[in-house]
Swiss-Prot record:
Signal peptide: none annotated. The keyword Oxidoreductase applies. InterPro entries: FAD/NAD-bd_sf, FAD/NAD-binding_dom, Fd--NADP_Rdtase_type_2, Ferredoxin-NADP_redctase_2. Its cofactor is FAD. Its EC number is 1.18.1.2. GO terms for molecular function: ferredoxin-NADP+ reductase activity; flavin adenine dinucleotide binding; NADP binding. This is Ferredoxin--NADP reductase 1. FAD binds at residues 35, 43, 48, 88, 123, 284, 325.
Amino acid sequence: MPNEVYDVTIIGGGPIGLFSAFYSGLRSMKTKIIDAEPAVGGKVRYFFPEKIIRDIGGIPAITGENLVANLKEQAETFHPTIVCNERVVDVTRLTDGTFQLITHNGSIHFSKTIVIATGSGTFEVNKLEALHVEDFPLAIHYDVKNIEQFRDKVVAVSGGGNSAIDWAQTLEPIAKQVHLIYRGEDFKAHEESVRELKNSRVKIHIHHEIHELFGTNNQLAEISVICNQTQATKTIETEALFINHGVKVDLGTMAEWGFEQADFGIVVDDEMKTTVPGIFACGDSATYPRKLRIIAAGLHEGPIAINSAKKYLEPTAADEAMISTHHESFIG
């Protein structure tokens, strides 16, 4: 029903939003997820479907695709309403305290509370800027769904963050050769990942940037890279390019919703409350002192936000849900 009112609407269907939906089910809250993308999973679904994630407790290693599938299955335990391809552009509090959410296509949703789990917002990858990029559209990759297509090929990765290093390490045992091109010197990645990279077969080109692409019939054969210290150039053989130059993020109209924001997200307290009563934030959407930006931390923040939403609606409710092993939904 279009005018149905939900106890909580979670804006964002990435890993944190999905787990928050599961936890809200434990709290018997009528739940809706609204996501701007065609499918749930957030940046993990888009950027990391075949990459291995290793920083979630109890899961030594899992692909992004499998993590999203597991979280979606878990989220659906209590049958939340999931709406995709809708970006929330306006939130208004009605006279009865209910929030009215309007999406970009004019759809209207109603909710008693809101949990923002949009990560850094909607995103657009930063594209490679180099000569003749337009001649090799099939050789330039910003996300990869099947790494087997690069088996026994020479490939190059451009970037210096965790994502670039993860891709270089993922491709290293599959590709004939992997080149990592980075315009800086000090990688912006986990120390252990950098150590493993330097001990691998990956050829590292620091202080270099991609300048020009070469090939025939739209088949990439070589790239020219330039040293930003000496301006010297060199040619690297490669059949495919992986570009990890970050993303442009857009919080859209959230800046107009009335809550306090800082450089790295929406300001929350230790209960994930924003400065607007009834609106909560978690995951990369939220910021507070000593914030840890990993999935495992967000999976902790989501339930805190849901518990706060529950207490907002029912001040006498229990502070937290019964643990799942004792929950009536999983007994008998």
